[in-house]
């Protein structure tokens, strides 16, 4: 679990987003995008790590963005278990798999927004802001709409 420095208070002023992905490249890219939009971000390598974080830091996370296909626990199961802990926690599913390969899993969670990788910071912003609101204060950096996952072949979902 990365927390990007210990100098931050336990409960940041900005809404905090938890990014869950078993692949380093999309996890770090999504984390950077979330921060470029002005939000705080935490990252987890899988669903088990994400659930531990949610249990250990109740009320800190305002949104979970999770990959669909991961070892140990898929994004759908993570969504169910996270909602058991925090019933109104917004969750976004994401994947680079072709829709035909994950359609059944996505269809099982019609209430959850879905992001197809690769996506832009602007696409992410359009999903995040209605769910948790804009950042409390303007961020020093501008969201880089050109930040994209550059190598789809390097990760599997």
Feature map (PLM): residue ranges:
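Receiver (REC) domain active-site loop signature in two-component systems and cognate sites
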Residues: 70
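Conserved sequence signature across two-component system core domains
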Residues: 20-21, 44, 64
């Amino acid at each position: 679990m990365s927390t990007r420095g210990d100098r931050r208070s336990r409960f940041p002023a900005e809404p905090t987003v938890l990014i869950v992905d078993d692949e380093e490249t999309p996890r770090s890219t999504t984390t950077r995008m979330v921060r470029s939009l002005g939000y705080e971000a935490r990252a987890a390598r899988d669903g088990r790590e994400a659930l531990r974080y949610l249990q250990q830091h109740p009320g800190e996370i305002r949104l979970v963005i999770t990959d669909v296909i991961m070892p140990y626990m898929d994004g759908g199961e993570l969504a169910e278990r996270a909602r058991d802990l925090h019933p109104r926690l917004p969750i976004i599913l994401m994947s680079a798999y072709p829709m035909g390969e994950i359609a059944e899993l996505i269809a099982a969670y019609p209430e959850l927004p879905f992001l197809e990788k690769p996506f832009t910071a602007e696409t992410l912003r359009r999903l995040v802001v209605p769910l948790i609101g804009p950042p409390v204060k303007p961020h020093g950096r501008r969201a880089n709409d050109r930040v994209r996952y550059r190598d789809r072949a390097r990760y599997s979902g």
